[in-house]
Amino acid sequence: MKKFPEGFLWGVATASYQIEGSPLADGAGMSIWHTFSHTPGNVKNGDTGDVACDHYNRWKEDIEIIEKIGAKAYRFSISWPRILPEGTGKVNQKGLDFYNRIIDTLLEKNITPFITIYHWDLPFSLQLKGGWANRDIADWFAEYSRVLFENFGDRVKHWITLNEPWVVAIVGHLYGVHAPGMKDIYVAFHTVHNLLRAHAKSVKVFRETVKDGKIGIVFNNGYFEPASEREEDIRAARFMHQFNNYPLFLNPIYRGEYPDLVLEFAREYLPRNYEDDMEEIKQEIDFVGLNYYSGHMVKYDPNSPARVSFVERNLPKTAMGWEIVPEGIYWILKGVKEEYNPQEVYITENGAAFDDVVSEGGKVHDQNRIDYLRAHIEQVWRAIQDGVPLKGYFVWSLLDNFEWAEGYSKRFGIVYVDYNTQKRI
């Protein structure tokens, strides 16, 4: 029997736009995901987050489920436009009330709240001013952060500035698959830089306002393996690791510079005097959050813009088409310790989508998900044995939910949601 350290936190994770529904209720403003999902062609089947899991009305039942399954921590995000409908300025008290109820109920049940300040639902009114491409967003984000710290920081001690900033910048502003749906490499890399500036300003405000809490940031990660021993394939894998994984952001945060292969590729797309901001970006953080789902084999490809292409392997895949590579979570954890040696690390998301069906007995037999989680948790344990200061593990996700551009077609929940009845199974 593998034992995890005393005090290790087992948790579940969600995000506001993916579960809440009622996006405009009680004075909330529109988010970019509201406008993006309401634009035909952006999301599979024309799905939107208008109802989602109706968590806005069923939050109490959902927290009871968290308690029932024995999770000791709950990672959730705050909807920026619920708190500041215009993005800055006037605070919406009803938005604060909603999250206050959630926080107080979690604490009554001895469940530790982990709050993600930004999980992709930017106020639409700020997008009209350029959104993440506007340098002023660092100040807008600091103002929003301050409102949260001042209202919730007395009770919430674990904070995450940004969820997966790479996805915000690249999938939202270069690939155009996520809100705001842009395809501009200059905007994408200005966004990378402004996300780092916003993160740093938020950390600074946190140090002034929350005296005994911890703050970190969360990254998406894939485990990139080279297709051969050839130098150019190894370099391709190194580039993907630096660009797609934690180094793109942790290198500036810990060392005050972008990683070498990223700079080689993207120097011309970054703001002209980006170096001037690096001193401010280099702020101490208390923990690093890592999300991990899948591994990839890559090779050098002279015809691709980044000189890299993916090599498909004959491996089991999830419903997302993602290859299942459990040892990748071990190498990502070991890598972050060796490269940056953070004080604390959390796995802030790990999980899988499968084609879940309700059986005749009214249950969902998701043995494939159980196998996926078990295999990854074994690798997480292995990383702890090798000295990674891992303090907790969060499953993605508590509930089936709005899976961004995939709509409701992909189910990640350890609890099944029947969207016709909102029944939790």
From Swiss-Prot:
Gene3D superfamilies, per database record: Glycosidases
Name by which UniProt lists this protein: 1,4-beta-D-glucan glucohydrolase
Alphabetical list of Pfam families matching this protein: Glyco_hydro_1
Molecular function as annotated in GO: glucan 1,4-beta-glucosidase activity
Record's keyword terms, sorted: Carbohydrate metabolism, Cellulose degradation, Glycosidase, Hydrolase, Polysaccharide degradation
Top EC class of this enzyme: hydrolase
Protein species of origin: Thermotoga neapolitana
Pathway participation: Glycan metabolism; cellulose degradation; Glycan metabolism; beta-D-glucan degradation
PANTHER family: GLYCOSYL HYDROLASE, LP05116P
Entry annotation: catalytic residues: E164, E349
EC assignment: 3.2.1.74, 3.2.1.21
